[in-house]
Amino acid sequence: MDDNKAKALKAALAQIEKQFGKNTIMHLGDDSAALDVDVVSTGSLGLDIALGIGGLPKGRIVEIYGPESSGKTTMTLQAIAECQKQGGVCAFIDAEHALDPVYARKLGVNTDDLLLSQPDNGEQALEITDMLVRSGAIDMIVIDSVAALTPRAEIEGEMGDSHMGLQARLMSQALRKITGNAKRSNCMVLFINQIRMKIGVMFGSPETTTGGNALKFYASVRMDIRRIGAVKNGDEIIGNQTRVKVIKNKMAPPFRQAEFEITYGEGTNHLAEVIDLGVEIGAVGKAGSWYSYGDEKIGQGKANSVLFLKENPAIAEEIEAKIRAEKLGVKDDSKAAVVAETNEELASEPVQ
């Protein structure tokens, strides 16, 4: 850039900062906050890896949708539990008026610290959300669900009245306000959504989500969660086999997917994921039905191996660290120590 352009740019930047305040405009490289995105784990190791950044991004809009009883609320409650473990403050906007505090506690949520609102209508729910976001004190807000955000006019009207596009307009207006505020306060806003069928679709999927198109555009991450099978103990069904597909991702490559088990009353079977992904990267050995870690056999069959890891959490954490290092490029301290030691040995050897 020549001197005249540089002077003109400097004058323009000074004028902008004078009029709108400091840090209104800056070089992208100067803003470390723009480069480092804080994440909250989903509670599923496979899904954290599929998201490409190790979890759900803070300061962004996130949407999770799927059919009934597919695990949408379970996944969001697990994310709340993980956020609370990091010392975060969370809020749950229960528009469906269906949150079970006993189940939330089973999934690890500290219900004493969880803020809960059960609003009367959609406008109230989204206004409460915006006020919480602007407070700067909340790390994560879950709205359950978009379909239940009923506009005030619809609630006050008669049962057969037509209210075409009211909810879509409400969502569009609210998201215009919430998106910028969420980024400034580093608060994640997670919307749970339901599926509806479009009439008369001949080609392609007839499925669509409720609340219009605004959420599809404003969301940085969109996840499609489906039940693909049952988890059985003998003849008794004890959980769901679940698949989550990352449909949209502004933080990493999209269209990755994760499969895991959700056990009724317990949530994601995290240790089973650790074993499966450990085998995949070679950290856990598998010979026939036996699993091993290093020179030690940890169990015959996955169920026994899960019990071993439950009794030995240090080994489970070690395997998980190796999986994250391999799949996400997260620094593995044990590997770094070995590399440093090897480099020292090579440096001490005489050059031939």
Swiss-Prot record:
Keywords: ATP-binding, Cytoplasm, DNA damage, DNA recombination, DNA repair, DNA-binding, Nucleotide-binding, SOS response. It holds the Pfam family RecA. SMART domains: AAA. It comes from the Bacteria. CDD domains: RecA (cd00983). One of its GO terms (biological process) is SOS response. SUPFAM superfamilies: P-loop containing nucleoside triphosphate hydrolases, RecA protein, C-terminal domain. It is found in: Cytoplasm. Gene3D superfamilies: P-loop containing nucleotide triphosphate hydrolases. The keyword ATP-binding applies. ATP binds at residues 66-73. GO terms for molecular function: ATP binding; ATP hydrolysis activity; ATP-dependent DNA damage sensor activity; damaged DNA binding; single-stranded DNA binding. PANTHER family: MITOCHONDRIAL DNA REPAIR PROTEIN RECA HOMOLOG-RELATED, RECA. Can catalyze the hydrolysis of ATP in the presence of single-stranded DNA, the ATP-dependent uptake of single-stranded DNA by duplex DNA, and the ATP-dependent hybridization of homologous single-stranded DNAs. It interacts with LexA causing its activation and leading to its autocatalytic cleavage. Belongs to the RecA family. This is Protein RecA. The lineage of its organism: Bacteria, Pseudomonadati, Pseudomonadota, Gammaproteobacteria, Moraxellales.
